[in-house]
Amino acid sequence: MQNKEPDEFRESTSIFQIWLRFRQNTIALFSFYLLIALIFTALFASYLAPYADNRQFIGQELMPPSWVDRGKIAFFFGTDDLGRDILSRLIMGTRYTLGSALLVVFSVAIIGGALGIIAGLLKGIKARFVGHIFDAFLSLPILLIAVVISTLMEPSLWNAMFATLLAILPYFIHTIYRAIQKELEKDYVVMLKLEGISNQALLKSTILPNITVIYIQEVARAFVIAVLDISALSFISLGAQRPTPEWGAMIKDSLELLYLAPWTVLLPGFAIIFTILLSIIFSNGLTKAINQHQE
C-alpha cells in the first residue's frame, strides 16, 4: 500500500467508459434525450411556440384540448379563460421554470461545491463549528426557508430563484462537506498524508473523483427541488407574476377553473411532474453506471 501512487486510490473511471455503461440503460438514455429536448425547447421557445404566449383569441376562451369533441387542432392543448393558447404558454413556460431551475442548480453546483470542499478540509474546532451551523439549517425544510426569504423581497421570478438558491445551498454544502470528511477518515488518506502529500494533490487525485457519485446525486436532487420550489413560490404569489407563463403561476391563475376547465390546471402540473421524473430517472441511471464501473 505504501508503494501506491495517489491516483491508484481513485475509484472513478473515464467519462467515455461511464457513457458506454449508461447507454445500456434504455430508459435512462431515453430520459436523457428528453431532458436535452426540454433544454432545447427552453432555449428556442419563442420559435417553437405556435403563438405568442399572451396572445388572446377572442371567442375561443376555455377551448378544450383538440382530442375532445369541441376541441380544435389549432389549439392542441386548448385555451384558458382569456383565450390564450395553452400549448404556447407551456412551451414558453419551459424557459421560465426549467431555465430558472437550471440557472439555480448551476450556481449551487459551483458555489456549493467550492464551499463544501473548503468546509470539508477544516479540522478541529472549526470543523465542529461548521457542522453545528449546518445541523441548524438542516432542521428546517428547504421550501420553508425559500418562502421566508421570498417574503423579505418583492415578488418576482428572479427573487424566487435567489431565494431557492439560498435555501438549497446549506444542504448541498453539508452533503459535500460530510462526503469529504468521511473520505478523509479512510486509511489511504492517512497514509498519503504521512508521506507528505498536499491537500490540493489529495483532492485532485483521489477525494474529488471518489465523491463524484454523491456530487451527481446532489446536483440532480437540487434540480428537482429547484423546479418544485420555483413553481411553489409562483403558486403562492411569491415568484413569477402575471402574465408570465411560469408553470406554477399558470396553475395558480387557473386554479378556480379546475372543475370547469381542468386542462388549464392539469397540463402545467403534468409538465412539472414530467420534468422531475425525467431528472430522477436520468440521475439514477448515471449513478448506477458510475457505481458499476467502480465495482
Curated annotation (Swiss-Prot):
Cited InterPro entries: BP-dependent_transpt_permease, MetI-like, MetI-like_sf, OppC_N
Signal peptide range: none
Residues of the ABC transmembrane type-1 domain: 98-278
Keywords: Cell inner membrane, Cell membrane, Membrane, Peptide transport, Protein transport, Transmembrane, Transmembrane helix, Transport
Subcellular location(s) of the protein: Cell inner membrane
GO molecular function, one term: putrescine transmembrane transporter activity
Main localization category: membrane
Family stated for the protein in its record: Belongs to the binding-protein-dependent transport system permease family. OppBC subfamily.
Recorded GO CC terms: plasma membrane
GO biological process terms held by the UniProt record: peptide transport; protein transport
Native organism: Haemophilus influenzae (strain ATCC 51907 / DSM 11121 / KW20 / Rd)
Record-annotated membrane-spanning stretches: 27-47, 102-122, 129-149, 157-177, 219-239, 262-282
Gene (UniProt): sapC
Domain of life the protein comes from: Bacteria
Entry-linked PROSITE patterns: ABC_TM1
Function (record text): Involved in a peptide intake transport system that plays a role in the resistance to antimicrobial peptides.
Protein name per Swiss-Prot or TrEMBL: Peptide transport system permease protein SapC
Membrane topology recorded in Swiss-Prot or TrEMBL: Multi-pass membrane protein
